[in-house]
């Protein structure tokens, strides 16, 4: 379980916000599902800040799958945003050079 979470560890906002939870939670707890399984008030409050992940079923398999899917989609969103900004910047600079030459 721990190995699977580590292999998906990417430096995204989701991973960073949930890394603090893993430090304070029990040994070997899944990152996003720690508060729902243990049932302590502080962790449930912290999980509700994360978002829809807090409403997981609480099973080990489900929360681990949501963790890896969460990090993957956030990582892909960041990549798509960067490529889109790069594309828009390139298009604008190309248009500016083209109209300046005329």
UniProtKB/Swiss-Prot annotation:
Transmembrane stretches, start-end: 80-97
On the Cytoplasmic side, which residues? 98-102
Q: Which residues lie on this side of the membrane: Extracellular?
A: 1-79
Glycan-carrying positions: 65
Write out the biased-composition intervals (Polar residues): 56-71
Q: Does the keyword Transmembrane apply?
A: yes
Keywords from the named record:
Glycoprotein, Host membrane, Membrane, Transmembrane, Transmembrane helix
Disordered: annotated segments: 1-71
* A cellular-component GO term for this protein: membrane
Task: Say if the entry is tagged with keyword Transmembrane helix.
Answer: yes
Which cellular compartments is it found in? Host membrane
Topology relative to the membrane, per the entry? Single-pass membrane protein
Q: Which family does it belong to?
A: Belongs to the HHV-5 UL15A protein family.
- What is the name listed in the Swiss-Prot or TrEMBL entry for this protein? Uncharacterized protein UL15A
| Species this protein is from | Human cytomegalovirus (strain AD169)
Higher taxonomy: Viruses, Duplodnaviria, Heunggongvirae, Peploviricota, Herviviricetes
Name the gene that codes for it.
UL15A
């Amino acid at each position: 379980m721990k190995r699977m979470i580590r292999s998906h560890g990417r430096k995204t906002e989701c991973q960073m916000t949930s890394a603090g939870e893993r430090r304070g939670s029990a040994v070997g707890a899944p990152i996003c599902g720690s508060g729902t399984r243990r049932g302590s008030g502080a962790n449930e409050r912290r999980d509700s800040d994360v978002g829809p992940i807090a409403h997981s079923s609480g099973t080990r398999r489900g929360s681990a799958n949501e963790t890896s899917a969460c990090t993957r989609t956030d990582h892909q969103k960041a990549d798509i945003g960067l490529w889109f900004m790069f594309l828009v910047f390139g298009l604008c600079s190309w248009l500016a050079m083209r109209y300046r030459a005329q």
